[in-house]
Amino acid sequence: MVRYFQKVMRRSEVDVAYSEGFSPHQKMSFASPLSVGVLSRGEYFDLEVNSTESSKVMLERINAQNAEGVEVLSYKLLPDDAKNAMSVVAGADYKVYTDLFNQNMLDAFMNQDQIIVLKKTKKSEKEVDIKPLIYNIKLEDDGIFMQVAQGSASNLKPDLVMDAFAKFAQVTLPEYVTYERIDMYCLEDDNLVSLDDIGGNIE
């Protein structure tokens, strides 16, 4: 996605700031990498620009260069003291499209004192209680909605939750399950706030 949007910024003639040095690159950073195969309608990236027009004009210019299925929904000016999106992400909403579970299964799963999973990293693997990292989870008509910890401090992938849920409920997940990231959040006064609520439109 980084390379894609770098090309879009060039084609839409956004006055992007570039790094200095031997190999200058656009000053762009995404809030949280999207796992391969995961859909999304809630991605965010920071972009440093030298100059800009109004949010309305910039959205029109950028979206005119976007491929079908990709749309930039907001273009906002961040406060001078704002940290980059990657460093402030604290949570994310996901939708898992499946009809294999019912409310009784979900209630029993979440009523456990702990939800222990084996979390693997490149260097090791260890048992982790992921229950505190599941902020909200509920059954919906077309699948399961969950809000989980996301970011540098704590990061819980939705497929890890679903693997634990399926094992608990003695359900076999199909090889391919559709996951969609809906939104991402930062913490403000111990409350999760959508990244889209940070900053303001440029008039």
Residue map of PLM features:
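Short, flexible, solvent-exposed loop/turn segments with mixed acidic/basic and small polar residues
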Residues: 34-38, 82-88, 134-140
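Helix N-cap motif at beta-to-alpha junctions
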Residues: 50-55, 100-103, 151
